[in-house]
Amino acid sequence: MSKNTIVQLILITGLAGLLQAQNAYDAIHKIDNENGFGTRALAMGGAYTGLADDYSALYWNPAGLGYIRNSQFSVELSHLNFQNEANYSGAFSMDNQTYTRLRSLGFVRPVPTARGSCVIALGYNKISDYDENLHFSGYSSVSNGIGFYFTDENEESEFYLFDKNVLRTEQISSAGGLHHWSLAGAIALSPQFMAGVTVALITGKEEYNFHFSQRDINDLFNVYPGDIDEYEINQYLISDIRGLGIKLGGNLQLSRWLRLGGTIKLPTYLTVNETYSSDDLITFDDGSDDGVEDSGRWKYTIKTPYYFDGGVAFTGHFLTLSASARYRDWSQTQFSIPKNQLAEADYRDLIIENSIIRNDYRETIEYRLGGEIKLPFLRTNLRGGYAYFPNPLMESDKTQDKQVYTGGLSLIVDHNINLDVAYLYSDWSRVSKDQFTPAGTLENIFLSKIIIGLSYSF
């Protein structure tokens, strides 16, 4: 037989199918890490629905813009450290990456009115991150189903497994996020009630890199022509995302010290255009190799569910306390399938994925708490907060929920300029698996983020 004529790779799923087939995870992943922006807001745990009264109200509650009395210009940068400790087949690995991003750039302008308030705002804001990484290596005796057909000169073929008792290595990195190019406005409908709306052009990009290899380190696969030394695969996927989002907000001044806020985020259709390429390579014991390459494009649309925010804030002379919650039913996320494409098998598969989302995901309530202490003699405000994000998977346990601990401070540089700093820390665990590592990998993730913001009022 000639091992230079590989005619087919038999995997758990085909290589092209692995890259093209969208699944329930893809739909949820595009929207499940929304953390917003705003140095003050995030330093207070994101408990900002009832309190929002700066440029970041454009995201948290557009009605809060109505409390702004001076024009504002603001800019923010973030620095993320993502550390992933992985346990695969009893072998521990650690991967650590950092990502520095422009977080927001925006402008707020009160419009002169005879009475009440009218304020507009516009700007760019990064509201979610796709930045993460994973690396592990370990010996596994669990079959992943990988095997190959080899043909000889007489076109006779024979199948050879290369599926277990090998050293496996996997490395995954993802970078990018969702961005809002937003226009918002707020008006006073009464002396106690503000209403607002934000319209956001949503753009996003995710660059996904995947590398997997498995080696016969004990020379167990040594019978020609199945004397395979190593199999490796590389995948590269770019996802471009477009959509239009609308958020409605209201804020009620219950008393001089107490405010109540709420928002409704309307469903959004996110169109995803994916470009992928892949290559895989078999290396034999004698050093020869053979492989295949593949590439293509894919387009699909995700419909996101409603979500509802509610919050309350107490503001005193020296102390501010706030709390908020967000309700979302993840099971209402779905792939939107045009009627004229139901005849195509790939799109019919998305109907099955919609059923999986409906059955495997659940409704959640996120909650956030925050506080701020003013120290006028130091021209400084100290902030702290906490946020809790339940895992949307129906069968997940508490260790997979995210808890975020936050803190920060604000320095009055001069009468019109504020420098704000926020620090966010969270850790959680998850079990990940794919076609190549069916036994699964336990990941312990530690995330820390520093956000620096500068605002100018005039």
Model-derived features: where do they sit?
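Bacterial Sec-dependent N-terminal signal peptides
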Residues: M1-Y25
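Outer-membrane beta-barrel porins/channels
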Residues: Q22-L42, R103-F458
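Transmembrane beta-strand segments of Gram-negative outer membrane beta-barrel proteins
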Residues: N23-Y48, G66-Q83
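Asp/Glu-centered strand-loop micro-motifs enriched in Gly/Pro and often flanked by an aromatic residue
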Residues: L42-S56, F92-M94
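Outer-membrane beta-barrel pore proteins
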Residues: A47-A52, W60-S71, P110-T113
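Short, glycine/acidic-enriched capping/hinge loops at junctions between secondary-structure elements
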Residues: Y55, E85-S89, F335
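Glycine- and aromatic-enriched membrane insertion/assembly motifs of diderm outer-membrane
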Residues: L65-Y67, Q72, L77-H79, L105, ...
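General structural concept
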Residues: V75-E76, Q83-M94, Y99-F107
